[in-house]
Design a protein with these regions (language model features):
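Nudix hydrolase/Nudix homology domain
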Residues: 1-111, 166-168, 210, 230-268
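Cys/His-rich short segments
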Residues: 99-150
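N-terminal strand-loop-strand
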Residues: 129-169, 174, 196-197, 220
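Surface-exposed, charge/polar-rich loops and edge strands
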Residues: 179
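Hydrophobic alpha-helical positions that pack around
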Residues: 185, 189
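Beta-strand segments within the central parallel beta-sheet cores of soluble alpha/beta enzyme folds
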Residues: 200-203
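Active-site-adjacent beta-strand/loop module that shapes the phosphate/pyrophosphate-binding cleft
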Residues: 206-229
């Protein structure tokens, strides 16, 4: 099915897909051994208390809402599952909608008051935006752009392990104000592992709900320098061939894994 984004809620509807969250966990319906996104008129009909319900669009012919769960009492037939864990239990399209829904719910929660004058914000009826009735400041959902890059040297990929983590992944970091994406790739690589890169090429992008980011993926070639982990974010880094990758690498839901898979396919 095709998801169509819309902030304009229908005047009436029978049932809808409800993407309801408590923290980073999403409510799912347990239906005969299947895990599904709840499809009902509204959560309260099943004793599920929510707040901040926001209409987000349609998935095929089904209307979609997101909301924050405010009750702690478990409800029979439903469960809360970490959004990271649900990837293998629902379709990729549903996971994409769920990721979008989480970002909208948290944006609605964290933008209740005007950052300029402190007045309570009002929700725009035609788009995803908050408007201050006092000073007319308009705020849109926060998206933090970040780069992620697969750096290759003589058929090997640079993978790094962050401090207090067991996972090895490619270099990533947030874009600073006034930077181009290519400048961010060069700066983050230099800062985190002490090398310079060349031939930076765009690969793909991915919204990443867990940090409200838009991940912009690149490939690049090693140019100069020796690996020196900064010790603040990166504790260990090295070059790996396709047949000697670390056991702990990012999962299949991430663009980081897509970059590593690209490397394996290209250089095997």
């Amino acid at each position: 099915m095709t998801f169509n984004v819309s902030a304009i809620a229908p005047a009436a509807y029978n049932k809808a897909c409800w993407y309801c969250f408590k923290g980073m966990s999403i409510l799912v319906a347990e239906n005969g051994g299947r895990t599904e996104i709840p499809f009902f008129t509204e959560p309260s009909a099943y004793g599920i208390k929510t707040s901040r319900a926001v209409y987000i669009g349609t998935n095929g012919s089904n209307h979609c809402f997101c909301a924050e769960i405010t009750s702690d009492t478990p409800v029979k037939g439903f469960a809360l599952i970490s959004l990271r864990q649900i990837y293998t239990l629902i379709s990729s399209d549903e996971f994409s909608i769920a990721s979008r829904a989480l970002q909208i719910v948290n944006w609605d929660l964290t933008h209740r008051f005007c950052g300029r004058c402190g007045s309570p914000m009002q929700t725009h009826t035609q788009e995803f935006a908050k408007i201050c009735p006092s000073c007319n400041l308009t705020l849109y959902p926060r998206i933090s752009p970040a780069i992620i890059v697969a750096i290759v040297k003589e058929g090997k990929i640079l993978l790094a392990r962050r401090v207090n983590s067991e996972m090895f992944s490619v270099i990533a970091g947030y874009v600073e104000a006034g930077e181009t994406l290519e400048e961010t790739v060069a700066r983050e690589t230099q800062e985190e592992v002490g090398i310079t890169v060349k031939n930076i090429r765009y690969f793909s992008s991915q919204p990443w709900a867990f940090s409200y980011s838009l991940m912009l993926a690149f490939t690049a070639e090693y140019e100069s320098g020796s690996i020196v982990p900064d010790g603040v974010e990166i504790e260990e880094a090295n070059w790996y061939s396709p047949d000697s990758l670390p056991e702990m690498i990012p999962g299949p839901i991430s663009v980081a894994r897509n970059l590593i898979n690209w490397f394996k396919t290209t250089y095997s």
